[in-house]
């Protein structure tokens, strides 16, 4: 739906020499369309004032900037100086798009691991319960099942409001949204109205950005102190979650979830059993107990299901409805996806686990399903937290029977250097298999596996590419694994 608004409505406190109708608010000069207002602020490596000519050539109707302008960058005579521009972008975008987040039931999910799975499972559940639901996160934006990639876990603030408006216009009545620590720290969700906030867990990640765990946790906690929030769903089995829960505003509806019998939990999983068919437990919501039989794989998916249950209860669904829909939820692409496991082929699991905690959870969960060996293929991304590389090696050595180290997304970093960092975490590095070619590593793992083994391919999950030296090459772990499994499935023997 096309929109336009007078600039004076968006900037009532700014003296304008002339008023214009603008058809959008855009920070990327390449994305400017005729009639847009170009927002020229400091970016990650450059300032928007350096791209005014390109924005003008693309039809920008106005140029906004935050004074003072950097030295050496000319300011067009008709550019509009807006004090505190960056801080008010969320409010401006919210107003321009007609306050889309207030027109839908908004659930924000934050945490180190489980954000994507929780968002996708919640959207799937709400859709099954008759509520058209949009998703916004790692897998993209769109109504459930029709997401289009954005390239961000949480987009920048102007696109975030535009995408929410798109979901509203497409008929979404609810939105499940991943809210990263970067987004909370950088104001990407400024002026987004959330009804329910969900916390999954806090483990080591992004310390290259936040510096330490205290600052990382403080960034996550910002979601739970937002004006207008009605309910908070918190994993009480996580140490930081327990602290966060105790500090919640008493005016909030606080819903603690636990699969480990935490006394303060109002939503819990009891009598938990994992088998080759999935997960079985009794869902207890404030004393109302209903059985859940889920086809999902892995102990941590119990936590994801409880997060979904807590969010649904916060949205006033009945416990019986919640238990029923949990059992209908199907796996998310790239999150503990199952391949093989029949006709002489080993069970192969593709998962996005790319942090120490996520890898440990994936391996520990699969150990409870394994009849024989657990083979792990993993690597670490380039230009990211180097401290987690030896940690992931130690976990793979401890939790798997065979560890194969390979390339993840080296990006602009030397792959041999990444592998060297990883190998430092092995007590016996000579026992690790190094095969930097990821496709070859996957074929090697599946080729050595017996029918009773489990192969975990960790790190990339849903990603359809591998980034090497700044170039994204087509690559899909699940597709490569399926190709490697084909001779096993057809012949029923090892190739």
Curated annotation (Swiss-Prot):
Annotated positions binding UDP-N-acetyl-alpha-D-muramoyl-L-alanyl-D-glutamate: 29, 153-154, 180, 186, 188
Binding, ATP: 111-117
Keyword annotations: ATP-binding, Cell cycle, Cell division, Cell shape, Cell wall biogenesis/degradation, Cytoplasm, Ligase, Magnesium, Nucleotide-binding, Peptidoglycan synthesis
Cofactor(s) demanded: Mg(2+)
This enzyme's EC code(s): 6.3.2.13
Record SUPFAM superfamilies: MurD-like peptide ligases, catalytic domain (SSF53623), MurD-like peptide ligases, peptide-binding domain (SSF53244), MurE/MurF N-terminal domain (SSF63418)
Keyword Cell division: yes
A cellular-component GO term for this protein: cytoplasm
InterPro entries: Mur-like_cat_sf, Mur_ligase_C, Mur_ligase_C_dom_sf, Mur_ligase_cen, Mur_ligase_N, MurE/MurF_N, UDP-N-AcMur-Glu-dNH2Pim_ligase
Pathway as given in its UniProt record: Cell wall biogenesis; peptidoglycan biosynthesis
Gene Ontology BP annotations: cell division; cell wall organization; peptidoglycan biosynthetic process; regulation of cell shape
The keyword Cell membrane is annotated on this UniProt entry: no
Molecular function terms, GO-annotated: ATP binding; magnesium ion binding; UDP-N-acetylmuramoylalanyl-D-glutamate-2,6-diaminopimelate ligase activity
Domain of life of the source: Bacteria
Family the entry assigns: Belongs to the MurCDEF family. MurE subfamily.
Protein name (database record): UDP-N-acetylmuramoyl-L-alanyl-D-glutamate--2,6-diaminopimelate ligase
Species of origin: Xanthomonas axonopodis pv. citri (strain 306)
Gene: murE
């Amino acid at each position: 739906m096309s929109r336009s608004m007078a600039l004076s409505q968006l900037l009532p406190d700014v003296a304008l020499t002339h008023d214009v109708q603008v058809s959008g608010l855009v920070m990327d000069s390449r994305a400017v369309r005729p009639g847009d207002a170009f927002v020229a602020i400091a970016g990650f490596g450059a300032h928007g004032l350096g791209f005014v000519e390109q924005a003008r050539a693309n039809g920008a109707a106005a140029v906004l900037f935050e004074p003072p302008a950097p030295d050496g960058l000319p300011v067009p005579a008709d550019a509009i100086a807006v004090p505190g521009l960056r801080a008010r972008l969320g409010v401006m975008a919210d107003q321009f798009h007609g306050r889309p987040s207030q027109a839908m039931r908004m659930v924000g999910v934050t945490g180190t691991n489980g954000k994507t799975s929780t968002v996708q499972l919640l959207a799937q559940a709400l859709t099954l319960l008759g509520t058209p639901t949009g998703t916004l996160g790692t897998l993209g934006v769109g109504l459930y099942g029709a997401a289009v990639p954005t390239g961000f876990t949480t987009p920048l603030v102007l696109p975030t409001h535009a995408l929410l408006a798109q979901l509203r216009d497409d008929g979404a009545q609810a939105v499940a949204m991943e809210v990263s620590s970067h987004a909370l720290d950088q104001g990407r969700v400024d002026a987004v109205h959330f009804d329910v906030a969900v916390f999954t867990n806090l483990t080591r990640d992004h310390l290259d950005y936040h510096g330490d765990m205290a600052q990382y946790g403080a960034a996550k906690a910002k979601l739970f102190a937002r004006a207008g929030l009605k309910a908070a769903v918190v994993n009480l089995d996580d140490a930081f979650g327990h602290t966060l829960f105790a500090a919640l505003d008493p005016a909030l509806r606080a819903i603690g979830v636990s699969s480990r019998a935490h006394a303060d939990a109002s939503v819990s999983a009891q009598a938990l059993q994992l088998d080759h068919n999935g997960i079985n437990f009794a869902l207890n919501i404030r004393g109302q107990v209903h059985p859940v039989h889920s086809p999902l794989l892995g102990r941590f998916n119990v936590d994801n299901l409880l997060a979904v249950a807590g969010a649904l209860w916060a949205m006033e669904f009945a416990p019986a409805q919640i238990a029923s829909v949990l059992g209908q939820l199907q796996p998310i692409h790239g999150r503990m996806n199952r391949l093989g496991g029949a006709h002489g082929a080993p069970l192969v699991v593709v998962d996005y686990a790319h942090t120490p905690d996520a890898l440990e959870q994936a391996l520990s969960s699969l150990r409870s399903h394994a009849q024989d060996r657990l083979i792990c293929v993993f690597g670490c991304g380039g230009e990211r937290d180097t401290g987690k590389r030896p940690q992931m090696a130690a976990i793979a050595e401890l939790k798997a029977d065979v560890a194969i180290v390979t390339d993840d997304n080296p990006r602009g970093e030397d792959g041999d250097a990444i592998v060297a960092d990883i190998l430092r975490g092995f007590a016996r590095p000579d026992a690790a298999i190094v095969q930097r070619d990821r496709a070859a590593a996957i074929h090697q793992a599946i080729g050595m596996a017996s029918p009773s083994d489990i192969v975990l391919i960790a790190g990339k999950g849903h990603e359809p590419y591998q980034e090497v030296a700044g170039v994204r090459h087509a690559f899909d772990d699940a597709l490569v694994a399926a190709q490697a499994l084909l001779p096993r499935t057809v012949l029923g023997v090892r190739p």
